[in-house]
Regions:
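Positively charged, low-complexity terminal tracts
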Residues: 1-93
């Protein structure tokens, strides 16, 4: 799967979405919560990215585990929406 952390569609206010470049923020959060070397390496790829980042399903699940409690729920939802190919309000809670 591919996620572009430079173009996350984040709900910044109720029912208002903005596209934000959060690759460094997400990369640092994944790095801080990385339980394995593989997730540490993913964090570095995200942090250094200038566009979409390719990752396996296992890496994606590791990313979600690493950022749980590290990032705002709205940012995590933006990551999930992009991974699922869903925009805006259509995302599941």
């Amino acid at each position: 799967m591919t996620i572009d952390f430079t173009k996350l569609n984040v709900e910044t206010r109720i029912d208002c979405f903005d596209v934000l470049d959060l690759h460094e923020v997400v990369g640092e959060a994944v790095f801080a919560g990385a339980p394995t070397l593989a997730i540490d390496e993913l964090a570095r790829r995200i942090f250094k990215s200038e566009g979409p980042v390719e990752m396996s399903e296992q890496e994606y699940n590791g990313l979600l585990g690493a950022v749980n409690g590290q990032l705002a729920f709205r940012v995590i939802q933006a990551i999930r929406r992009q991974a699922e190919g869903v925009d805006g309000k259509e995302a599941r809670p």
